[in-house]
Regions:
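ABC ATPase NBD Q-loop/coupling interface
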Residues: 69-88
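The feature captures the beta-strand-to-loop junction immediately N-terminal to the Walker
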Residues: 45-47
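Conserved ABC ATPase "signature" region
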Residues: 123-148, 196
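Conserved ABC nucleotide-binding domain
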Residues: 79-80, 139-155, 160
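Helix-to-loop junction immediately C-terminal to a conserved catalytic motif
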Residues: 60
Length: 254
């Protein structure tokens, strides 16, 4: 594994280089390279079929690439692991639809997700340590749900459920967060609050955010990567990629 990292001069939380994968002759990912630094937030945009979901599937071990390198922190080859193992290594993934347990409180949802529990349901009957309590309170404050910690998750707004699931995800202490269309279905106010949350998260985690909402991406104020036909079409600030003629033709102008 050390041989794989000899030519990587910089430190990366996530390193994809020359990655390709085909399904029944269709090249879903085509020589894709993506380099995410520790503490970096990156927005990923592109039309339907651009390869955004497949890219995340490859990173998380759901799909094996045909060629290329996929490394975590420069030296861990993620292609050797399945989804559960990749999650334990330190790569967390949040899908578009929230998957909180609505019959439990906000506090209990985060309690269940805390890393190191022997089993999901046993943790409900296992006394929390002072350290556990402190960690849960820190997460509740981070996701701005400390005042709703006793409320049932079912009674939260869509945006609050998204924040709760993000809290559950970070309770497992991932170093890289992959987040799929977080702003979908949110109110304008929730969207802006989510952007602020992500900025706070980026101080301790690397974030890869797949999104269609350009106002949300603008609020993130981060580097943007545009995917098209499974490859990187353009990278830069949102203003830079919006002015790119190729991007206008294949995506933003549609």
């Amino acid at each position: 594994m050390s041989l794989m990292t000899k030519h990587i001069e910089n430190e990366y939380a996530l390193y994809m280089d020359g990655v390709s994968v085909s399904f029944d002759g269709f090249k879903a990912i085509n020589n894709l390279s993506l380099y995410i630094k520790p503490g970096e937030m990156r927005a990923i945009i592109g039309p339907n079929g651009a390869g955004k979901t497949t890219m995340m599937d490859i990173i998380t071990g759901k799909t094996r690439p045909d060629t290329g390198k996929v490394l975590f922190k420069n030296d861990t080859d993620l292609t050797k692991y399945d989804e559960a193992e990749v999650a334990n290594i330190g790569v967390g993934r949040k899908f578009q639809k929230p998957s909180v347990i609505e019959s439990l409180s906000v506090f209990e949802n985060i309690e269940l997700a805390l890393k190191g529990k022997r089993s999901i349901w046993q943790s409900l009957f296992h006394a929390l340590s002072d350290q556990d309590h402190q960690r849960i309170q820190e997460i509740l404050e981070l996701i701005a749900l400390q005042d709703q910690q006793d409320a049932l998750a079912a009674n939260l707004s869509h945006g609050q459920k998204q924040w709760l699931e993000i809290g559950m995800l970070i309770s497992q202490e991932p170093e890289v967060l992959l987040i799929d269309e977080p702003a979908a279905g949110m109110t304008d106010e929730e969207t802006m609050k989510t952007a602020e949350l992500f900025k706070r998260l980026a101080k301790k985690h690397s974030l890869v955010v797949v999104e269609h909402d350009m106002d949300f991406i603008k609020a993130l104020d981060c580097k943007v990567t545009v995917l098209h036909e499974g490859r990187v079409l353009a990278e830069g600030s949102l203003e830079t990629v919006q002015a790119n003629q190729e991007v206008i033709e294949v995506y933003l102008g549609r």
